[in-house]
Amino acid sequence: MAGVTHADRCPGVLRPHLAQDGAVVRIRFPGGQTTGAALSLLSGIAQQFGSGDLQLTSRAGVQLRGLPDPVPAALIAAVREAGFLPSETHERVRNIIASPLSGISGGLVDVRPLVADLDAGLCAEPRLASLPTRFLFVVDDGCGDVSGRSFDLGYRAVDHDHGWLLLGAADLGISVPASHAADMLLALAREFLVASRRSGDVWHVGELRSWSKRVPGVRTLNLPLERTDVPLGAVGGAASVQVPLGSLTPAQAATIDATAAGRVVITPSRGLVLPGAAGRLPELVAAGFVDDASSPWSAISACVGAPSCQKSLIDTRAYAMRLAESGHALPRTHISGCERRCGAPAGAHHDLVVPTGSPLLLVGESR
């Protein structure tokens, strides 16, 4: 059985995090690529051992909450046997997000093969197990959706055969052949580890701006950036839906398994894309998914809140429910139970924060 460590709170399966509501494990799906059957299997594990719901993350992964501490060996075995733990040494550094609609709609190239190569190379390099667990790779198919987020290293396609390697932001990059992109991203990750140790074990490439500017071939860029939200509804024959507050219930997981034609993409905005399932949108909406960008649920997110988190002073999800049921049009809004603002969305949004020193005060901030 695996116990909880407090040295690093970014959880994995073998390194859970202990929250107020029990242990939390996180499963990475590089590029958000999974299947309806996989989500159904994880839902069954969550029902057997934890709270029952699956929590989608802003890095296109899945968390199981409310688990016993230590986490049962049977849970770990089930996750391993399902293929969700391909590298026990690297599980917490397999943080790769990609353009969710790549190969479905828009974009210049299908980047899924690059994501697979990057993940395989990452897991094959022993030194890269030492990357900070918050270190993030992004792979953009050229539409500018994920390269506008906060990240550490990235690739953005220019055409089918070329792209930019991005260092810490979309304004610094190196022109590379697409066929070399995975190897060069991994080489830069190794160089970052060396540079970060010399600088006092920093966590992110953005903290080493002077190092980034000295990388051979680096240039200042002015790339156009798009919204980070994935369009909802029928998109390129796919069904694109938002999962309210990122919580996938057992019934919803069963609906996804029944309606998905195989592949499912978890989006960084805590939604799901089901290729080839545009005709099944009525069933998905009936199950509680959102396919309309004018719905309040498409604009509201929240941290897990009380009582699940001891730092939170309010039940953020209950507050989000009241906001959504008000029927008012809302700007992109994130509700946080403390100043840490866990789970805040990428891009411009308003924060509603309960400062820890003033439990009755709700503060709105434009971010």
Language-model features, listed with the residues they occupy:
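Small-residue-enriched alpha-helical segments and adjacent helix-cap loops
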Residues: 2-3, 22-165, 171, 176-179, ...
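Intrinsic, low-complexity N-terminal interaction/targeting segments
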Residues: 3-18, 291
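An acidic, glycine-/histidine-flanked metal-binding catalytic module
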Residues: 156-229, 254
